[in-house]
Amino acid sequence: MNIYIDESGSINNHMPNNRYFIIALVRVIDSNSLKRAYKRFVSSNYDRLLALDTDKLHPITGEVVKEGGKMFQNGFFHELKGSCFDKEMKTQFVDFFSRTPTFEIYFIKISNEKLTDHFCKHTARTFN
């Protein structure tokens, strides 16, 4: 059995922009089918993924507000990054992978505003 774990956000009750800390777990049911689906998704959306992975520029100043180059490295596909997806691609991704039950998703959502200073002060306990 394969279980993949990823986190998003920060455990901190003094950063109003970080409202939640999320831990996601993906339990793979059929790894071969999932690998094939992943490759199919990437190949059928290659040009769109490449376009989404470019630097995002401020419309007035032209400064880079969000760096690209996270899904593609040295001109080759590396990995999917949900942070690079727009709403349309996120919807397409969910629709595509929910067709066949190749994995299950579990998550833990921690509301940072409910954490106490006492809890956050003890980092060993907080992060373990």
What kind of feature is each model-predicted range?
Residues M1-N128:
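Phosphate-ester processing/binding pockets and catalytic centers
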